[in-house]
Design a protein with these regions (language model features):
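A compositional/biophysical signature of low hydrophobicity enriched in polar/charged and small residues
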Residues: 1-148
Length: 148
């Protein structure tokens, strides 16, 4: 994906929506000194090119009965990095995937139901992906200012 060219107004709109994704276009326009139509067009363009997505987020503290995991992953061969990256992103339990420098090649954020779900994810879903050499799983016990 080619990075989109963003100007100051785009960044201001993104900042306001990051604070509250439900802010009315007219309110954003009033604060930034442009029309509601300009804001609407900018938001539509940002969404079409894949820069912006507006969605609800959940505080993981309220996911009773669920486990939030961070899993560090090392791959066997660097030529498989993108293939493993893409495959991880297709797993329904995986909320995000990142390529890293440092100790791990990749890290994933995972939400599963119960401890049984942890075992099932690790031994079935994750184990089915070719190219993974080793993993280290961290069960998140508490978060602060962290949303899914």
């Amino acid at each position: 994906m080619q990075p989109a060219s963003l100007d100051r107004l785009d960044w201001q709109i993104i900042a306001m929506l990051s604070e509250n994704g439900r802010t009315a276009n007219s309110t954003i326009g009033d604060k930034l000194g442009v029309t509601e139509g300009t804001i609407r067009q900018r938001i539509r363009r940002l969404m079409e090119v894949g820069v912006l997505r507006i969605s609800g987020q959940v505080n993981p503290e309220f996911l009773e009965g669920h486990q939030l995991l961070l899993v560090g992953i090392n791959i066997g061969e660097s030529s498989q990095l993108m293939k493993v990256f893409e495959r991880l992103g297709q797993l329904p339990e995986v909320k995000s995937v990142a390529i890293l420098s440092g100790r791990y090649d990749l890290i994933i954020q995972v939400v599963v139901e119960s401890n049984h779900g942890v075992i099932k994810f690790l031994t079935e879903s994750l184990a089915s992906i070719e190219g993974i050499r080793a993993t280290e799983t961290f069960i998140v016990l508490k978060t602060h200012n962290y949303w899914l």
